[in-house]
Amino acid sequence: MIFPSHDSQAFTSVDMEVGNCTILTEFILLGFSADSQWQPILFGVFLMLYLITLSGNMTLVILIRTDSHLHTPMYFFIGNLSFLDFWYTSVYTPKILASCVSEDKRISLAGCGAQLFFSCVVAYTECYLLAAMAYDRHAAICNPLLYSGTMSTALCTGLVAGSYIGGFLNAIAHTANTFRLHFCGKNIIDHFFCDAPPLVKMSCTNTRVYEKVLLGVVGFTVLSSILAILISYVNILLAILRIHSASGRHKAFSTCASHLISVMLFYGSLLFMYSRPSSTYSLERDKVAALFYTVINPLLNPLIYSLRNKDIKEAFRKATQTIQPQT
């Protein structure tokens, strides 16, 4: 990646000189605020959010793993979603916390690529997993008598494995395509993590091919998963409308309400960030959108799936009784 040489008094960087150009070896992540007075406050806020997110998601994973009453397809998918959210927030938050307590805002080229790659793995995998969860809810509501046979252990495992495989393959294409670009100007990224949009803004090469490849990868994944979710929920809605009793309709809807909220939060923030025309591009708005799907969504998902879930509440109650010292 080629940068013209430039002087910087605020930051120092390690570059390799080749001819009259400089090969970049690191980026500078500005984060949320350059004001040093805000750094302790931001550190405290993000540390609190990080600890709550980790504890919430790992509690769900452990409960689903250890309680035999939660060994069902629905909770199998919820457990994998919680693991993804645990992974997602861990890709970004430690670097955010480190930048809040250190004046060194640098991230190596390899570190930037790794951060983009692993964030893409989680994002793409979650797209596929949410579609698989919609199919699970479709099978439970539309064909309840055949549900156990339809959502077999082999099928559930295959859907989750396929989600991860698709996530890794898409992430490889996304990351490799991004880092084939040449960048010009200062190596300063006005963001709190290495994401494709701010990197593309720094590119000094023609991004037409990049945009076509990225549109194909992102477009296929997002549109295909949204289409699968929409088809599932149209069938679910039709099945609910055929239920005669109000209590039956309420119970059927409540089984998929949490998933529907999670879908709207995740895809809403992604579409807000990536579907807007370039003329309306704003780094500040992108920071807010990125903060939502990288930090807020993983924080909210454990609450969404557990607050009104009697099975998880009961499993948590039994777990706390088990670990309490006998008196």
Curated annotation (Swiss-Prot):
It is a multi-pass membrane protein. GO terms for biological process: G protein-coupled receptor signaling pathway; sensory perception of smell. It holds the Pfam family 7tm_4. Keywords: Cell membrane, Disulfide bond, G-protein coupled receptor, Glycoprotein, Membrane, Olfaction, Receptor, Sensory transduction, Transducer, Transmembrane, Transmembrane helix. Residues 65-71, 135-152, 234-252, 308-327 are cytoplasmic. GO terms for cellular component: plasma membrane. The chain crosses the membrane at residues 44-64, 72-92, 114-134, 153-173, 213-233, 253-273, 287-307. Glycans are attached at N20. Its main location: membrane. Disulfide bonds join C112-C194. GO terms for molecular function: G protein-coupled receptor activity; odorant binding; olfactory receptor activity. InterPro entries: GPCR_Rhodpsn (IPR000276), GPCR_Rhodpsn_7TM (IPR017452), Olfact_rcpt (IPR000725). It is found in: Cell membrane. Residues 1-43, 93-113, 174-212, 274-286 are extracellular. Belongs to the G-protein coupled receptor 1 family. Odorant receptor. This is Olfactory receptor 9G4. It comes from Homo sapiens.
